[in-house]
UniProtKB/Swiss-Prot annotation:
<dbReference type="Pfam" id="PF00749">
    <property type="entry name" value="tRNA-synt_1c"/>
</dbReference>
<dbReference type="InterPro" id="IPR000924">
    <property type="entry name" value="Glu/Gln-tRNA-synth"/>
</dbReference>
<dbReference type="InterPro" id="IPR001412">
    <property type="entry name" value="aa-tRNA-synth_I_CS"/>
</dbReference>
<comment type="subunit">
    <text>Monomer.</text>
</comment>
<comment type="function">
    <text>Catalyzes the attachment of glutamate to tRNA(Glu) in a two-step reaction: glutamate is first activated by ATP to form Glu-AMP and then transferred to the acceptor end of tRNA(Glu).</text>
</comment>
<dbReference type="GO" id="GO:0005829">
    <property type="term" value="C:cytosol"/>
</dbReference>
<dbReference type="InterPro" id="IPR049940">
    <property type="entry name" value="GluQ/Sye"/>
</dbReference>
<dbReference type="InterPro" id="IPR014729">
    <property type="entry name" value="Rossmann-like_a/b/a_fold"/>
</dbReference>
<dbReference type="InterPro" id="IPR020751">
    <property type="entry name" value="aa-tRNA-synth_I_codon-bd_sub2"/>
</dbReference>
<dbReference type="GO" id="GO:0000049">
    <property type="term" value="F:tRNA binding"/>
</dbReference>
<keyword id="KW-0436">Ligase</keyword>
<feature type="binding site">
    <location>
        <position position="110"/>
    </location>
    <ligand>
        <name>Zn(2+)</name>
    </ligand>
</feature>
<dbReference type="GO" id="GO:0005524">
    <property type="term" value="F:ATP binding"/>
</dbReference>
<keyword id="KW-0862">Zinc</keyword>
<keyword id="KW-0067">ATP-binding</keyword>
<feature type="binding site">
    <location>
        <position position="108"/>
    </location>
    <ligand>
        <name>Zn(2+)</name>
    </ligand>
</feature>
<feature type="short sequence motif" description="'HIGH' region">
    <location>
        <begin position="11"/>
        <end position="21"/>
    </location>
</feature>
């Protein structure tokens, strides 16, 4: 094993990558970058029955989206490839047959029916289910349908020092003679990961806590094959708010779903880093560079992390507010294009969107909220009840006069900018013996169709003189057509 830090992210394409899986990738990436080492991606595609088409592409898309660049792996190559296990089958067979030849593994001819019956009987007798080792000492050879099992030592213990959990010990007698090579010639995870971690000179294995019980099997394989094992660190689980294992019932679990929902990659990297690691007890916002500088296994928790959706939304809002108008506009465009009102408006372009984004940047927590916050700044097809133009303490006639006066004042402005508009409209309210909020409310409804909208005069400036005055004229017409009402 090399002295260089070499870690790997080794997903199985049996589904789309969930957050826990990507959190593991990120901790490996941070560990490699912190130590000036290498981050390797290896696709463990040996479970052909559960293989999901498109899963590999989704895995790589997730890594690319989060900026977790790899030094070796798919699309990159490297000195230790290939990086798909399905392309490395001869290596696993050679290792398995070596173990058989040395008496450390054996061919098992038991049928699946026999194994099922064995487990049923064990459960009926209230015994822990497992293989009864009936083929262990029979010296059987290869035949169709046979598997190769590893010979577990029947006594003693297997111990190792986990870099997060400390000393961990397992009784060998409680381990099963596990399969290392299946009847179809594909290896199990146990054999393939050990062979590949050795061949790729992996120095540290950072993986999910669920793999902790498998570690004695892997250490036994390392010893039997004459390999030096890597150092192990088992990362804490991620739980939902109810402290059960994070699942779809808690909300989205696929990384790509978070991308589609409008979370920023910067947010996800920051948020996921805090699921099991902390720099101190108060700092929550970290740049990528800070995470690389601060990350260490000594500060990874042994206890499960709780996924807090409210905190994620808060953090995403914080990151959205740090973006420049240009950057936010570029990121917003794909989401705005999906809104039919905006898409049909004729105003959706990057230059205009750069002007719109600062109006709503403070209110958005996710990119997929942007369209609802600003569609009326794009679309001129705004409809509303004209009664909303009338303040609850005013009459139709008073409101109509106020709107006409405001329209005339706005038409006369040499510069149609927010500062000029406020400079002339605020005094107008006093002249009309209205509160500023009453006049501003009428103009807000007239120019946006909304009662709650972005800052009024800045919005009117972005709309521009022609569109804004056209909307106010339409409001005056609608209000004029309304029957008079009681004061």
């Amino acid at each position: 094993m090399t002295n260089e830090v070499r870690v790997r992210y080794a997903p199985s394409p049996t589904g789309y990558p969930h957050l826990g899986n990507i959190r593991t990738a990120m901790f490996n990436w941070l560990f490699a970058r912190h130590n000036g080492g290498k981050f390797i991606v290896r696709i463990e595609d040996t479970d052909r029955e559960r293989y999901v088409e498109g899963a590999v592409e989704s895995i790589l898309e997730s890594l690319n989206w989060l900026g977790l660049d790899w030094d070796e792996g798919p699309d990159k190559g490297g000195d230790y490839g290939p990086y798909y296990q399905s392309e490395r089958l001869p290596l696993y067979r050679k290792a398995a047959e070596k173990l058989v030849a040395e008496g450390k593994a054996y061919y098992c001819h038991c049928s699946s029916e026999k194994l099922d019956k064995m487990r049923e009987d064990q459960i009926a007798r209230k015994e822990p289910p497992g293989y009864d080792r009936c083929c262990r000492d029979r010296g059987l050879g290869q035949k169709e349908g046979a598997v190769i099992r590893f010979k577990i030592p029947l006594d003693g213990q297997t111990a190792f020092t986990d870099l997060i959990r400390g000393e961990v010990t397992f009784d060998n007698a409680k381990q099963d003679d596990f399969v290392i090579l299946k009847s179809d010639g594909f290896p199990t995870y146990h054999l393939a990961s050990v062979v590949d971690d050795h061949a790729m000179q992996i120095s540290h294995v950072l993986r999910a806590e669920e793999w902790l019980p498998s570690t004695p099997k892997h250490l036994m394989l390392y010893k039997a094959l004459g390999y030096t094992p890597p150092l192990y660190a088992h990362l804490p689980m991620i739980l939902g708010p109810d402290r059960s294992k994070l699942s779809k019932r808690h909300g989205a679990t696929s990384t790509i779903e978070y991308k589609q929902a409008g979370y920023l990659p910067e947010t996800m990297v920051n948020f996921l880093s805090l699921l099991g690691w902390a720099y101190d007890d108060k700092t929550e916002l970290f740049s990528r560079e800070q995470l690389i500088e601060y990350f260490c296994l000594e500060k990874v928790s042994k206890t499960a992390a709780i996924f807090n959706y409210e905190k994620l939304d808060w953090m995403n809002g914080m990151y959205i507010r740090t973006l420049s108008a240009q950057d936010l506009a570029c990121r917003a465009m794909p989401f705005l294009e999906k809104d039919a009102r905006i898409a049909a408006s004729g105003h959706l372009n990057l230059d205009y969107t750069v002007k719109v984004m600062p109006l709503i940047q403070e209110r958005a927590k996710k990119l997929n909220e942007l369209a609802e916050l600003c569609w009326f700044i794009y679309s001129d097809d705004i409809s509303y009840d004209p009664a909303l133009l009338i303040d609850k303490k005013l009459t139709k006639e008073t409101s109509l006069s106020a709107l006409k006066a405001a329209n005339a004042r706005l038409e006369a402005l040499p510069n149609f900018d927010a500062a000029s508009m406020e400079e002339h409209i605020r005094p107008l309210a006093a002249e009309l013996e209205l509160k500023p909020g009453q006049l501003f409310g009428m103009l807000r409804t007239a120019s946006t169709g909304q009662q709650v909208a972005p800052p009024l005069f800045q919005t009117m400036e972005v709309l521009g003189r022609q569109r804004c005055l056209g909307r106010i004229a339409m409001a005056i017409a609608r209000l004029s057509e309304m029957p008079s009402q009681r004061s």
